[in-house]
Design a protein with these regions (language model features):
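Acidic, small-residue rich beta-repeat scaffolds with periodic aromatic anchors
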Residues: 19, 24-37, 49, 125-131, ...
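Beta-strand-rich domains and repeat architectures in extracellular enzymes and scaffolds
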Residues: 27-66
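N-terminal secretory signal peptides that target proteins for export/translocation
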Residues: 1-7
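Blade-loop segments of beta-propeller domains
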Residues: 78-95
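Structural motif
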Residues: 55-69, 111-119, 167-178
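Bacterial N-terminal signal peptides
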Residues: 10-22
Length: 203
């Protein structure tokens, strides 16, 4: 009977311990960073993140630490667009067009994939464009692929860079390409240039 009571007591103690740990983890307050202001200074990106997951340098918020991503109006900080529910975390900076009506950003979708997303301003609202795969055919069997925005050539025309690693040690390729978005939000590749091609063993 005494042994049974001890076992029950130990089980209760463990349950209380794990409950406290869970509550503590849920109660960790998020830190916030406002960054990537639009050229007209009317908008910015607010990142909510877990400060316990920041690297020692703390210069850049890793995707794994990101909990919230919001486009906010300045200076009121009213949320204009919430893209927190997107899979992955922000990779690098948000790239704004010269007229502050377009912005593009890369999302890290794990260790093997990074994709670029684009948003467009209509009136006082921003909408995410429902683009299909925003990339080009690198000419091989791809294992890893990372697409990031570089700059807006002009409003509506975006320059991107795509780095692809091929399966079976077949090397890699880096391609820069430009896309133009039409009135329906669909993109058309207007130029492409392979700037590097090499063997994976060289990396």
């Amino acid at each position: 009977m005494l042994s049974m009571r001890r076992e029950v007591g130990n089980a209760l103690a463990l349950a209380v311990f794990f409950a406290c740990v869970t509550v503590f983890a849920e109660d960790i307050p998020l830190a916030e960073k406002v960054t990537d202001f639009s050229p007209d200074k009317k908008f910015a990106v607010r990142i909510g993140y877990d400060p316990s997951q920041l690297p020692e340098s703390g210069d850049e918020i890793p995707p794994d630490a990101t909990r919230k991503l919001e486009l906010i109006a300045m200076p009121s900080e009213e949320v204009v667009l919430d893209f927190s529910n997107e899979e992955g975390g922000l990779q690098g900076k948000v790239i704004w067009s010269q007229d502050s009506k377009w912005f593009a950003y890369a999302l890290s979708l794990g260790q093997r994939v990074a994709e670029t997303r684009v948003c467009h301003r209509s009136g006082e609202r921003f909408e995410k464009l429902k683009t299909e795969y925003l990339g080009v055919d690198p000419g091989g069997d791809v294992r890893n692929e990372y697409v990031k925005p570089l700059r807006w050539v002009k409003p509506g025309t975006l320059l991107l860079e795509q780095f692809s690693i091929f399966r079976g040690g077949a090397g890699d390729a880096t391609i820069q390409f430009a896309v133009r978005f039409d009135a329906d939000g669909k993109f058309h590749v207007v130029s492409r240039k392979k700037i590097r091609e090499g063997n994976e063993q060289e990396n």
